[in-house]
Amino acid sequence: MGDWLLEAATAYNRDSYEQRDRYASHLLIPLETMRTVIRWSMESIPDEVLIGFDPNPERPNPEAVEEAFGPPQSSFSGSGFLLGEPHIVNVGDSYSVHHVPEEWTDGAFSEERGARGSRFASFLHSHPNAYAHPSQADAEAADWTEGVEMILGVRFSPAPLGLEWYDQEDGHRRDLKPEKDEELPVLARVAGRKVHGFELIGYLRNGEGVNLLITSPEGFPIGLDL
């Protein structure tokens, strides 16, 4: 992935800092975790991938981050700790991807927990050639997420029929790409396709946005001097 992800994380975190007042909570994502998530999302194209996480209980958020972004006004499972290791839960289309296979579910509670009846606190799924904006299926699945629900939009070309990219202006957009003058840069290549950019958002099951930060292993946001 080269150095573009470091540049993208720096730009993303600066935006997170500038917009910190619009969010009631924040979540720290280690850079290498983000790198893995991006790789899995690219490798799964044209399908979506569902990834599960638990918080890392050995990595509380650094005090400097809490001071800069303020104490969270909304609580969620894993709040106050870095995001833990990623695990691929499922790969499929926009509806089937939200089904959690039996090996990841807690049988005693799966019926009560609905579509997300698994042991993971937080989830991320990819949107191939689509904005990072929750669909109706996404919103219904998020009703059972106790932590943070995240979406990674992936823009690529050439696109299979039915997965063409359409520009839209509505909604809150959070780009994850380097600050370059190129309108359509090529960040990576996979299976004969060019990957041009990403979007990344997080939200709680009540629809409230979560401010995401990409960090060092210790939890310090890349590119921010706190």
Label every model-predicted segment.
Residues 1-122, 128-226:
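Conserved beta-strand-loop surface patch within small alpha/beta domains used
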